[in-house]
C-alpha cells in the first residue's frame, strides 16, 4: 500500500523550513509537558534522522534514561506529509496526519505521546 504524494506547490526549502518549525514546536510541547507533569525528570527531545531516502524519522529520546529512544513520527521528504509510525523502520501508510507546510506546521496533529490517531 502506498500513500500518494501530494504536490502542494511547496519547494524543498519550504518543506525543510516547515520540518524545522515542526520539530521546534514538538520540543516546546515536550518541555512544557515535562515541566508541569514530571518536574523531576529531564524532558524528552525530538531529533531528526536524515538516513532515509524517502522519509525523515523523528526520534524521541531521553538521554538521562540510558539513551531510551522511540520513533515519534515520520515526515515524507517529497511533500512534508506527517505520518504516524507503524514500527521503528516504517510509517503507517493509511493516511497523512497533516503537513509540515500547514499554517501551524502540522502541530495540531501532534501530542506529547505521538501523532494523533485518525478519527
Language model features by range: what are they?
Residues 2-17, 87-93, 100, 118-119:
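Long, terminal "pre-/pro-" and other extracytoplasmic accessory regions
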Residues 4-41:
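Short, non-transmembrane alpha-helical segments in secretory-pathway proteins
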Residues 14, 48, 63-66, 94, ...:
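Compositionally biased, low-complexity repeat tracts
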Residues 42-74:
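Exposed beta-strand-loop-beta-strand "reactive/processing" segments of non-cytosolic proteins
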Residues 51, 57, 100, 106-112, ...:
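Accessory DNA-engaging acidic/polar modules
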Residues 59-64, 78, 86, 118:
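Small/flexible residues
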Residues 76, 112-113:
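Domain-scale terminal segments
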Residues 79-108:
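A short, surface-exposed interaction/processing loop segment used at functional sites
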